[in-house]
């Protein structure tokens, strides 16, 4: 039985997207799919177009899914926050949370690129300030 879960809304320039997780979250094949509604009639099932997978495993990262979207403090960058696995084997013990900047294609669709490996450095968001987060004792 197919599994689709964790829908997240993404809007840009009047376009409406729903990004969702597909497959079992414990598997290497967990990925993100995308629904696009080009005409705004959200209650009409025929108005939605399905695309996917739009963010999926690589040879270093597996089980990519369950995301959220945020903007940088200056509102100029779009970021995706997502889970991934560092091993191919089924299970949840190797699941991590990652953040990555993403772009928009010339077609108006989000372009998430490839998921980052566990140890990949990332540039901080634009106009972010270094912060110290106190750790609980």
Regions found by a protein language model. Name each.
Residues 1-137:
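Carbohydrate-active catalytic/glycan-binding domains of CAZyme proteins
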């Amino acid at each position: 039985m197919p599994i689709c879960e964790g829908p997240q809304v993404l809007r840009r320039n009047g376009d409406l997207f729903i990004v969702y997780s597909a497959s079992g979250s414990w598997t290497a094949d967990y990925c993100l799919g995308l629904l696009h509604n080009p005409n705004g009639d959200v209650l009409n099932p025929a108005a939605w177009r399905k695309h996917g997978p739009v963010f999926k495993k690589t040879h270093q990262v597996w089980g990519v899914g369950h995301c959220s979207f945020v903007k940088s403090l200056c509102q100029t960058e779009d970021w995706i926050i997502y889970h991934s696995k560092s091993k191919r084997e089924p299970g949840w013990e190797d699941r991590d949370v990652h953040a990555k900047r993403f772009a928009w294609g010339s077609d108006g669709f989000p372009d998430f690129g490839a998921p980052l490996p566990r140890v990949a450095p990332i540039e901080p968001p634009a106009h972010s300030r270094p912060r110290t987060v106190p750790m609980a004792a």
